[in-house]
From Swiss-Prot:
It holds the Pfam family MHC_I_3. This is T-cell surface glycoprotein CD1b3. Residues 1-17 form the signal peptide. The lineage of its organism: Eukaryota, Metazoa, Chordata, Craniata, Vertebrata. It comes from Cavia porcellus. GO terms for cellular component: endosome membrane; external side of plasma membrane; extracellular space; lysosomal membrane.
Length: 332
């Protein structure tokens, strides 16, 4: 039976009956990465995501589910969740076994990697779109559409063979369809409600400027750091007056340990042209009050530190003078 357990990859944690509206589409999806190093060594990663936020994991050694948020189970009971976790354990074992059993038939050579993603996405109008896709070696392989397995062009004859072998198992496709189009939407709406306070929090970004190295003589790299913001969407741009500079280079938005985000935005300029440039930051938590940092302007925090240090030096000098005077007068 060729990779029949693949369909269980669409099993999602069912719960919930309340819809929570989001301005941007948001999805719940499960991702799996299985690396077949050789016939006896296989590694896998299984995780559940709400948008860009990981809320589930699984210990690959023990098969124990990891709930990363207090609300990761949504409204699902412990008993129901235990049943789903057990299903995943069975699925992983069977998926690895069946894949290894058909390595030769599908002309796969070690090492190779299989990826998969399954879930559903809620749009602002209330529509929910479900999906299940598999990849082989980073290329699209198969997907689930209209109650059937659809081979991807990149998958070639190998993907076509997999879909042909799965085609007779109508009960399996019925189960997948039910999970994708009924179970997943129920869970998505439920977990959005359970995690509402956390998901809707607004954390203001902190921003600062620095300089970076550049390989061109006479040039300067301006770096604008933006950190500690939530939610993830943010707009950062180097500006000259009110004009956006298209040469701005935006890095990847990276996660901080506390669940907030960090972004680094750079601009390479001729050193003499850096004066008058600024970095502008827009974020939903700022209430329309953009952060604007001007290159070359002194940092207010720096002035505060300088003032404190100056005061300390003054009082130290005064104390030394005072005690010296007392000593000269014979008091000490």
């Amino acid at each position: 039976m060729l990779l029949l357990e693949l369909v269980f990859f669409a099993v999602l944690f069912p719960v919930g009956d309340t819809q929570d509206a989001f301005q941007e589409p948001i999805s719940f999806h499960i991702t799996q990465i299985t690396s077949f190093v050789n016939s006896s060594w296989v590694k896998y990663q299984l995780s559940g995501w709400l948008g860009d936020l990981q809320i589930h994991g699984m210990d690959s050694d023990s098969g124990t589910a990891i709930f990363l948020k207090p609300w990761s189970k949504g409204n699902f009971s412990n008993e129901e969740m235990s049943e789903v976790v057990e299903l995943f354990r069975v699925y992983i074992v069977a998926f690895i076994r069946e894949t290894k059993a058909h390595v030769n038939a599908l002309q796969m050579e070690y090492p190779f990697e299989i990826q998969g993603i399954a879930g559903c996405e809620l749009h602002s109008g209330g529509a929910i779109v479900s999906f299940l896709q598999g990849a082989f070696g980073g290329l699209d392989f198969v997907s689930f559409k209209n109650s059937s397995c659809v081979p991807a062009p990149e998958g070639g004859s190998r993907a076509q063979t997999v879909c042909k072998l799965l085609a007779p198992y109508h009960d399996i496709f019925y189960t997948v369809e039910k999970l994708l189009y009924e179970t997943c939407p129920q869970y998505l709406l439920g977990v959005l409600q359970a995690g509402k306070a956390d998901l809707h929090r607004q954390v203001k970004p902190k921003a600062w400027l620095s300089s970076g190295s550049t390989h061109e003589p006479g040039h300067l790299q301006l770096v604008c750091h933006v950190s500690g913001f939530y939610p993830k969407p943010v707009w950062v741009m180097w500006m000259r007056g009110e004009q956006e500079l298209p040469e701005t280079q935006r890095g990847d938005i990276l996660p901080n340990a506390d669940g907030t985000w960090y972004l680094r935005v750079t601009l390479d300029v001729v050193t003499e042209e850096a004066t008058g440039l600024s970095c502008r930051v827009k974020h939903s938590s700022l209430g329309g009050q953009d952060i604007v940092l001007y290159w070359g302007h002194s940092n207010p925090i720096g002035w505060v530190i300088l003032a404190i240090v100056s005061c300390l030096i003054f009082f130290l000098c005064f104390a030394l003078w005072y005690f010296r005077r007392l000593r000269c007068e014979g008091i000490f």
